[in-house]
Amino acid sequence: MASSMMASTAAAVARAGPAQSSMVPFNACRSSVPFPATRKANNNLSTLPGNGGRVSCMQVWPPEGLKKFETLSYLPPLSVEDLAKEVDYLLRNDWVPCIEFSKEGFVYRENHASPGYYDGRYWTMWKLPMFGCTDASQVIAEVEEAKKAYPEYFVRIIGFDNKRQVQCISFIAYKPT
């Protein structure tokens, strides 16, 4: 058996020989110019790159007092038309709208130092996911109903992709005053 394996290996090596002699190495990604050995010293500080003077209009989010909630929390509260546009985007991507509500609109820990089920990551779902929903007005009507039932709670809209089994978008639809 060992002699038959050696014979088949020798035949395979003999066949591979002529094919390799006709192959040419691939050089398309190589540069013909070598890398520079030294860098040019830039002692002139007036030529440093800038952002066109836009720094003066940037602000820093204050770390105390203003909580960030979800994806669009840095914007002013969304109007009904803005919510409808977001829900239309959600529906165009074939995501299932879900409405959730919670007393606290952010992650918090009151029972233990390590993360757990009751630390604000999981919100209560309002009714069932809206499978088969094709109109943003249906989702807006459910948000209004949730606001009426729980006026002191946060309400958020989630877009769930049931093909990939992931949550793709989440934003606050209502903040209590």
UniProtKB/Swiss-Prot annotation:
<keyword id="KW-0602">Photosynthesis</keyword>
<dbReference type="Pfam" id="PF12338">
    <property type="entry name" value="RbcS"/>
</dbReference>
<keyword id="KW-0601">Photorespiration</keyword>
<dbReference type="GO" id="GO:0019253">
    <property type="term" value="P:reductive pentose-phosphate cycle"/>
</dbReference>
<feature type="transit peptide" description="Chloroplast">
    <location>
        <begin position="1"/>
        <end position="56"/>
    </location>
</feature>
<dbReference type="InterPro" id="IPR000894">
    <property type="entry name" value="RuBisCO_ssu_dom"/>
</dbReference>
<comment type="function">
    <text>RuBisCO catalyzes two reactions: the carboxylation of D-ribulose 1,5-bisphosphate, the primary event in carbon dioxide fixation, as well as the oxidative fragmentation of the pentose substrate. Both reactions occur simultaneously and in competition at the same active site. Although the small subunit is not catalytic it is essential for maximal activity.</text>
</comment>
<dbReference type="InterPro" id="IPR024680">
    <property type="entry name" value="RuBisCO_ssu_N"/>
</dbReference>
<dbReference type="GO" id="GO:0016984">
    <property type="term" value="F:ribulose-bisphosphate carboxylase activity"/>
</dbReference>
<comment type="similarity">
    <text>Belongs to the RuBisCO small chain family.</text>
</comment>
<keyword id="KW-0120">Carbon dioxide fixation</keyword>
<keyword id="KW-0113">Calvin cycle</keyword>
<dbReference type="Pfam" id="PF00101">
    <property type="entry name" value="RuBisCO_small"/>
</dbReference>
<dbReference type="GO" id="GO:0009507">
    <property type="term" value="C:chloroplast"/>
</dbReference>
<keyword id="KW-0934">Plastid</keyword>
<keyword id="KW-0809">Transit peptide</keyword>
<dbReference type="InterPro" id="IPR036385">
    <property type="entry name" value="RuBisCO_ssu_sf"/>
</dbReference>
<comment type="subunit">
    <text>Heterohexadecamer of 8 large and 8 small subunits.</text>
</comment>
<protein>
    <recommendedName>
        <fullName>Ribulose bisphosphate carboxylase small subunit, chloroplastic 3</fullName>
    </recommendedName>
</protein>
<keyword id="KW-0150">Chloroplast</keyword>
<dbReference type="GO" id="GO:0009853">
    <property type="term" value="P:photorespiration"/>
</dbReference>
<dbReference type="InterPro" id="IPR024681">
    <property type="entry name" value="RuBisCO_ssu"/>
</dbReference>
